[in-house]
Regions:
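C-terminal amphipathic helix plus adjacent low-complexity
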Residues: 200-313
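Conserved donor-binding/catalytic core segment of Leloir-type glycosyltransferases
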Residues: 48-66, 72-75, 92
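Short alpha-helical donor nucleotide-sugar binding micro-motif in glycosyltransferases
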Residues: 132-137
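Aromatic "clamp/platform" in nucleotide-sugar-dependent glycosyltransferases that forms part
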Residues: 145
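Short hydrophobic beta-strand element within catalytic cores of glycosyltransferases
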Residues: 162-165, 175-176, 182-189
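A short helix/loop element that forms part of the nucleotide-sugar donor recognition site in Leloir-type
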Residues: 30-49
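Nucleotide-activated donor-binding/catalytic signature segment of Leloir-type glycosyltransferases, i.e.
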Residues: 103-128
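A short, active-site helix/loop in glycosyltransferases that binds the activated sugar's phosphate group
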Residues: 1-19, 24-32, 105-108
Length: 313
């Protein structure tokens, strides 16, 4: 759904809205076989243990809203339920800055939680190398409390990798939640988000972590915006769920996500995104009418901007 349509309300009655989701080059991000020579060499270069049973990947900036400490806490809760031998065959890779002022000191967080199977990759990788990194992973995790889209999830899907993610912002668009009729959900002014889990049926490639706390934050330029937070305990349960699936099942659901991302319904490829932009631009030129040189407005016609939906939905 186009968020502009919800925000504008009656002011958007005579406007045309088109939803164009993010798309990526599916020739750069793609599924590789386990014996692919480049993938094997990349694993050696990263010094990844050859006997790993479970490799979880986080890929984003070290900034506060990405909630990396919550991810590490969830990992701690998850690995505490494993035996010492099982722990040795699990790894969480954080592809991000180790220490960054807009975020935090991640080595200190890792030390605080006492987890030995978390590593940080803070050097730059090419797009081709990033695709290799996704292909080393059994799953991707992104628990942001505010996220416009979450490109790491799209990259994961195109590489055939399932993901664990917070149900907020555009990340829920990539989970394919279904409505009562089995259709990909279209949000409206009554139900603008599924962050609290009204709808539970979703694509198998997604392991959603529903929001436990929504607060209101803001600034003078943006007076109010929702700040969604997950419970790390629930995130740890999704990690355990993905872990217990085994490699064959993880590969199966990852393939389902890849097929959906490549298909016409989702269209998360750069080619499909470009075609939608072309179609929308053509429609604009066909329907566009020049604005009047001037308009008269009554400054007494002030309409208050009031919450358009129930707080609990």
């Amino acid at each position: 759904v186009n968020i502009n349509k919800l925000v504008l309300g009656d002011k958007g009655k005579n406007k045309i809205f088109k939803y164009v989701p993010h798309g990526l080059n599916n020739k750069l991000f793609s599924k590789l076989e386990g014996d692919d020579k480049k993938l094997v060499d990349f694993k050696k270069a990263l010094q990844l243990p050859t006997d790993l049973d479970f490799h979880l990947l986080f890929n984003s900036r070290n900034i506060r809203r990405k909630q990396i400490p919550d991810t590490i806490m969830a990992w701690k809760l998850f690995t505490d339920k494993l035996s010492e031998e099982e722990n040795k065959k699990c790894m969480l890779t954080l592809k991000t800055e180790a220490i960054f002022e807009p975020g935090t000191d991640l080595p200190a967080v890792i030390e605080y939680f006492g987890v030995n199977n978390v590593r940080i990759l803070d050097h730059k990788l090419s797009t081709q190398e990033m695709n290799l990194l996704y292909n080393t992973a059994d799953g991707v995790v992104l628990l942001s409390n505010a996220e416009g889209w979450g490109l790491a999830l799209t990259e994961a899907m195109l590489s055939g990798t399932p993901f664990i993610a917070a149900v907020t912002g555009g990340m829920q668009d990539q989970m394919r939640f279904e409505d009562e009729d089995g259709k990909w959900i279209e949000f409206n002014s009554e139900i603008p988000s599924n962050h609290h889990g009204r709808y539970k049926k979703h694509g198998e490639w997604a392991l959603p972590v529903y929001i436990k706390s929504s607060s209101i934050v803001g600034s003078p330029s943006t007076p109010y915006i929702y700040d969604d937070h997950i419970d790390p305990k629930e995130a740890s349960e999704r990690m355990m769920e993905l872990y217990k699936m085994g490699k064959e099942e993880r590969s199966r659901i990852g393939k389902l996500g890849m097929e959906w991302a490549l298909g016409d319904e989702a269209g998360f490829t750069s080619e499909k995104m470009s075609n939608k932009i072309i179609e929308s631009t053509d429609l604009l030129f066909k329907t566009w009418k020049p604005r009047n040189k001037y308009v008269f407005l009554k400054d007494t016609e002030y309409v208050k901007r009031v919450l358009p939906h129930k707080l609990i939905y």
